[in-house]
């Protein structure tokens, strides 16, 4: 069963970020890290974390596991559906969700577009990170 649930500290112990997420952190000059488990949610498959994410106000984020690429087409559609449900829940609280994505993370850019992200001609870190926003009905 795939679900989004509160993150447990043990999720971090078994979670390995996907290659592009590691490269994105390096492009930002940091090591992949997470806030406290109490500030995160986990998208899990039978308890195994496929993605860990959350928000700081209207700034949203998700880091995917190195196992997501192994999902069947049906499981990938369920993953997307759950992310969209979480997006909708956040859009009940905030008019706009936003963040910056590393321009080299093409798989996340493609995914973000499928869930309604709009990319703006606004960049940070010498053009390496591009602003995206997600709005209701956007």
Curated annotation (Swiss-Prot):
The source organism is: Escherichia phage T7
Q: What is the lineage of its organism?
A: Viruses, Duplodnaviria, Heunggongvirae, Uroviricota, Caudoviricetes
Give one Pfam hit by family name. Answer: Phage_T7_Gp13
* Role according to the record: May act as an organizer for the correct association of several proteins in the surrounding of the head-tail connector protein gp8.
The superkingdom of the source organism is: Viruses
Q: What is this protein called?
A: Probable scaffold protein gp13
